[in-house]
């Protein structure tokens, strides 16, 4: 039985790592989309910036862009 438990723990750890990798890939993809929209990912948009979307990363959830001056 100890061999089966070691395999189970190894498989569980591998699944957790895979879940983290796929989340990171999505965050990188959203950051690239924000760059294409001429924005940047920040924790909070500054007063002279407008929120144009979400980066959905833990530390930088908003995609911010400078407001256009009329």
UniProtKB/Swiss-Prot annotation:
Where does the UniProt annotation place the signal sequence?
Answer: 1-26
KW Secreted (keyword) present: yes
Cysteine-cysteine disulfides: 41-55, 45-64
Sorted keywords for this record are: Antibiotic, Antimicrobial, Defensin, Disulfide bond, Secreted, Signal
Q: Which GO terms describe its cellular component?
A: extracellular region
Where would you say this protein principally sits, based on its record? Answer: secreted
Q: In which tissues has expression of this protein been reported?
A: Specifically expressed in testis.
Which GO terms fall under biological process for this protein?
defense response to bacterium; innate immune response
Question: In which compartments does the protein localize?
Answer: Secreted
Output the InterPro entries linked to this UniProt entry.
Beta_defensin_dom
Keyword presence, Signal:
yes
Q: Which domain of life is it from?
A: Eukaryota
The record's similarity note reads: Belongs to the beta-defensin family.
This chain's function reads: Has antibacterial activity.
- Name of the featured protein: Beta-defensin 107
What organism is recorded for this protein? Homo sapiens
Q: Which gene encodes it?
A: DEFB107A
């Amino acid at each position: 039985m100890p061999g089966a438990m070691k395999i189970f723990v190894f498989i569980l750890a591998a699944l957790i790592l895979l879940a983290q990798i796929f989340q990171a890939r999505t965050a990188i993809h959203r950051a690239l989309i924000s760059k294409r929209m001429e924005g940047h990912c920040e924790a909070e948009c500054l007063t002279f910036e407008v929120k144009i979307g979400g980066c959905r990363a833990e530390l930088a959830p908003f995609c911010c862009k400078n407001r256009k001056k009329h």
